[in-house]
């Protein structure tokens, strides 16, 4: 029997912290509609992501992908740095 891996989720966000070793905190903004008033609101979610070579810096725009649990709170990894901080 061959097991097939499902599609992994990807998100684009901005690095807000790089203080930890091999870990960065990525803030991902999503637009949601208020259920009653129908106004579009920005929601920010912070994900801890694995950064193997400590390449990311605060302000970098990165692509993160879901992965197996790497620690208590870390379930994402940095796939690519899309844009460097200025």
From Swiss-Prot:
Q: Which UniProt keywords apply?
A: Ribonucleoprotein, Ribosomal protein, RNA-binding, rRNA-binding
Q: Which domain of life is it from?
A: Bacteria
Recorded hits in PROSITE patterns, A to Z, give: RIBOSOMAL_S17
SUPFAM superfamilies in alphabetical order: Nucleic acid-binding proteins
Q: Give me any GO biological process, just one.
A: translation
Annotated GO CC locations: cytosolic small ribosomal subunit
Which InterPro entries does the UniProt entry name for this protein? Answer: NA-bd_OB-fold (IPR012340), Ribosomal_uS17 (IPR000266), Ribosomal_uS17_bact/chlr (IPR019984), Ribosomal_uS17_CS (IPR019979)
One Gene Ontology term of the molecular function aspect: structural constituent of ribosome
Member of which family?
A: Belongs to the universal ribosomal protein uS17 family.
Q: What does this protein do?
A: One of the primary rRNA binding proteins, it binds specifically to the 5'-end of 16S ribosomal RNA.
Which PANTHER family does the annotation name?
40S RIBOSOMAL PROTEIN S11 FAMILY MEMBER, SMALL RIBOSOMAL SUBUNIT PROTEIN US17M
Q: How does it assemble?
A: Part of the 30S ribosomal subunit.
Put simply, this protein is called Small ribosomal subunit protein uS17
Q: Which organism is it from?
A: Caldicellulosiruptor saccharolyticus (strain ATCC 43494 / DSM 8903 / Tp8T 6331)
Which gene codes for it? rpsQ
């Amino acid at each position: 029997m061959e097991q097939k891996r499902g599609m992994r989720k990807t998100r684009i966000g901005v690095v807000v912290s790089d203080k930890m070793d091999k870990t960065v905190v990525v803030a991902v903004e999503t637009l949601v509609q208020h259920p009653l008033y129908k106004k579009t609101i920005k929601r920010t979610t912070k994900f801890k992501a694995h950064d193997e070579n400590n390449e990311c810096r605060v302000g970098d725009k990165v692509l993160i992908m879901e992965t197996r649990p790497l620690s208590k709170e870390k379930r994402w990894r940095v796939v690519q740095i899309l844009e460097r901080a200025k």
